[in-house]
């Protein structure tokens, strides 16, 4: 079997199981990233504790690309077709409402706890919401609005592109959405000027290409195990070994090789996503049910997990309790448990379940 060989039955229920596994792993990685960020930003650069935090953070950096790949796998390969009206009447309003409500929650709660909610404060909050000044991790919802808006175009392309065109599209995205933006962020394009500097795609537009990668992989047989392992290892090395010396040199966290759609996170995402496809091919009903339950709550967990982390910090749970090698996974599990409990409560409220989570 050759790598990237198409499967004869690309659109199957088994594919959905693979996406459930991927979403479950991706939300775990999201929480690891935010837990370990306390270590990367608060410990001495290059210390043993800092390196332990960098280890966990590097391993988890495929999270956002994996979520984008899941979107591509789900929405670009529908045998029943895609309806533009449904996107604009259901998907985009869902993201918009969730974005503004949860952005408001993240702004109101700190002010409510630490200062008075005056009319002036509420006016300031409203202006910040309208200007897009939202909690940092909600940037993903901004990206998803663009991904959904472009979906009728990308879906049509996916439905009609032949093998050669598919590979060309993927190569185009790797060059302009992954490599050039990374070189630019590292300052390696400073010698150039003019319109060339506008060639690299921004993260928002590059995300659309990442959904294509998910579609490309899901409708093919799983990559060989050795290739999957190599991609994960390469991605980790780029993130860990690339960030360590750069941070030592600058005296602060140099996160260019950890962020966005840089090569390290993309290698990790592609490797873990392919691993999930392989696991999804196996008959294990119990694991499938667990993955389905966890992935169903992944959007809610993404939205609320920072609130849970702040509550945990308030009651004394942080990465400083013990070494990051242990405290990062421990706090991650606590945060996931608390966030998922919130999901189980909120999903019982019909309009909240429909529009906010």
Language-model segments: which ranges?
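Alpha-helical transmembrane segments and terminal signal-anchor/GPI-anchor hydrophobic tails
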Residues: 7-9, 222-289
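Long hydrophobic alpha-helical segments that form multi-pass transmembrane helix bundles
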Residues: 164-220, 231
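Interfacial loop-to-helix transition and helix-capping segments at the boundaries
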Residues: 54-64, 129-143, 184-209, 240-271
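Membrane-interface helix termini and inter-helical loops of multi-pass transporters
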Residues: 42-47, 118-120, 124, 186-195, ...
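Extracellular/periplasmic helix-loop-helix junctions in multi-pass membrane proteins
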Residues: 247-257, 285-287, 291, 310-331
